[in-house]
């Protein structure tokens, strides 16, 4: 699923066409969400459906929620009008604050707070236990899963909804990454074939899981899909020779996973050559 034309020369992986009504039935709820929030709330609903928990007020009322989210989306029309007025010398003192207060919806004026995703999930799906939001991307998502697992293993939580959402179809985001020359350009190619044209293709996606203790799952007769045993992460100074290799060698023993005993999910960016 690749789009090479809408944001040319940048390559993106677009979100498939969804019927948000299936998981967010109220149009009013949908209208006050930006795309990344609709994606996340939709994915959270799918996870609850799959776990057999949709509408179970008793469990949803105590279900914990840990979400990873970015800093929200910008209103490009407002940005463009402000910059155009400034370039023409039409920006008087207080102009910027006045335009922001008058032109942006309340949620955008609040800088699209990251925890709005968790708030919308709570409103739409009734998940009312403790809530944590980590602002960021790969590292935030890994920490969300890591902390949910740790809380369940320690007995601090029995069941948790964990996940993240991202909208990669944003001109403002592509511009930010282009400042660092991080975008994949012109045409898509698998990471193993990107030598000489490094970069990653931004994508739109939502992913949510219901994690729960074995005892809790068995008590409600739930059939598990998999067992999560370890979540590990590290930060490597990539400019230092051998840093990535040392980081991977340090993390691998902590997983305790072999080719015959489990599956491995990685948060590698897809950029060559580090992936």
What is the meaning of each model-derived region?
Residues 86-104, 146, 150, 165-220:
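Glycine-/small-residue-rich "gating" segment that lines the acyl/pantetheine channel
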Residues 1-4, 184-266:
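Condensing-enzyme catalytic core mediating Claisen C-C bond formation in acyl metabolism
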Residues 8, 12-13, 167-191, 234-247, ...:
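Active-site-adjacent elements of ketosynthase-type condensing enzymes
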Residues 40-53, 114-127, 131-166, 201-222, ...:
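Active-site-proximal alpha-helical scaffold in enzymes
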Residues 32, 105, 109, 132, ...:
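Conserved short-loop catalytic and cofactor-binding motifs
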Residues 2-125, 129, 166-168, 173, ...:
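Conserved beta-ketoacyl condensing-enzyme motif
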